[in-house]
């Protein structure tokens, strides 16, 4: 009798283990599908490039946060631009194919505007620019072994593992997007997708790239939350 009970328990363990594995794979496919189909959200983006020369350093970049819609591309955000160790507050808008920038320079308000490139190729387009949204990275969701999985209630976080093979995959995706060469750079990354297993929706996308070489270092961070929220510009 005891052997029969142990046999049943072992069988249930195998079945439940299989279900759990399938559940993880299913969630990863939902994440991939949702990421490809994301329509809008609250985007936060930051780029900081520091160059050191003759005992001095120069910071160039920006940080921005606001609501964004992707098709057609529309944006309403605010933040700062950094240049030559000075920072300028900015407001950014994209509407009807035109990019508007409001900046405060030397206590004066200055407006600029320019057309958005064909195909919505714009530095503030999260869906186009974020490493987490590139095809080569999204395809890594097809293999659950690429991801560390943590659960907090209904929230499931998938974090891309740190291996030499995956680092090369991230490099390849970034080089394909930017055409920059990274052979001589120290390179690190964070890529996460947060999924709600109850609503079966992706809740947040996070990525960070760090690369540096002698005399320069660059950090790129971005995130998207409140995914598919209504956005009015």
Indicate where each model-derived feature is located:
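Short, surface-exposed coil-to-beta transition loops
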Residues: 56-64, 85-91, 96, 186-190, ...
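Positively charged n-region of N-terminal signal peptides that target proteins for export
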Residues: 1-8
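Beta-turn initiation residues at beta-strand->coil junctions
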Residues: 45-49, 79-83, 102-106, 206-212
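An acidic-aromatic
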Residues: 67-128
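N-terminal leader/targeting segments and the immediate start of mature chains
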Residues: 6, 15-70, 74, 229-233
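Extended lipid/amphipathic-ligand handling interfaces
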Residues: 30-34, 63-70, 92, 96-99, ...
């Amino acid at each position: 009798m005891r052997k029969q009970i142990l046999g049943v328990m072992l069988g249930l363990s195998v079945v439940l283990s299989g279900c759990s594995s399938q559940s993880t794979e299913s969630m990863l496919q939902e994440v991939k599908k949702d990421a490809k189909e994301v329509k809008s959200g609250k985007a936060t983006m930051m780029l900081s490039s520091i160059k050191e020369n003759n005992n001095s350093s120069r910071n160039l970049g920006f940080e921005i946060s606001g609501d964004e819609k992707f098709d057609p591309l529309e944006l309403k955000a605010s933040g700062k631009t950094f240049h030559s160790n000075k920072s300028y507050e900015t407001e950014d808008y994209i509407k009807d194919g035109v990019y508007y920038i409001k900046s405060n320079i030397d206590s004066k308000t200055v407006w600029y505007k320019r057309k958005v490139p064909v195909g919505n190729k714009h530095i503030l387009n999260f869906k186009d620019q974020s490493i987490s949204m590139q095809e080569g990275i999204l395809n890594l969701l097809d293999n659950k072994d690429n991801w560390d999985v943590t659960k907090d209630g209904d929230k499931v976080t998938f974090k891309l593992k740190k291996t030499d093979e995956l680092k090369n995959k991230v490099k390849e995706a970034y080089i394909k997007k930017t055409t920059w060469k990274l052979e001589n750079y120290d390179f690190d990354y964070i890529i996460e997708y947060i999924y709600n297993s109850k609503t079966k929706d992706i809740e947040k996308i996070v990525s960070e790239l760090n690369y540096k070489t002698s005399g320069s270092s660059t950090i790129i961070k971005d995130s998207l939350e409140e995914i598919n929220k209504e956005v009015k510009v």
